[in-house]
């Protein structure tokens, strides 16, 4: 598989659904950008993925990454991680990340430290549903992996196959 490759999924920009004054606020987008840069420079050393990954019936993940699986000759097989970033509303992020667990081997909620501390009080919810909880401080470029679920099969293997096909076609794998 490739070393590191980010791809554009050319998904519909959901910010267009918002009023003009709200649609220009880019806090969450900036947070996601900082998180993506950190992941690609410090966490992942190989794989392919990108921002705003739409999968029909499962929503649009803020960020997905396909990691190569050991001993698998086909580049389209591997481990799929999906991430949902939010600045405040951890409950909404949890709902979305849980939905991504249908096509991902692991899905994560990523929050800034302050809302992350609030979400930590409900850590048992994340553990029960195997949804990861990470906090990220963009100013300090510090990632805290509060809970990382064990790698497991997605809840819907056919949905994963479809997701991997979309990534493979966009990434020319």
Locate predicted features.
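Catalytic cores of nucleic-acid endonucleases
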Residues: 80, 85-135
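Non-catalytic C-terminal interaction segments of nucleic acid-processing enzymes
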Residues: 1-11, 16-19, 128-173
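Acidic-basic catalytic patches of nuclease active cores, encompassing PD-(D/E)XK
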Residues: 2-69, 74
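Short, charged, solvent-exposed linker or helix-capping segments at domain edges/interfaces
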Residues: 73-77, 157-160
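Flexible, glycine-rich phosphate/dinucleotide-binding loops
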Residues: 72, 116, 142
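Short hydrophobic-acidic sequence motifs that mark active-site Asp/Glu residues
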Residues: 60, 64, 79-84
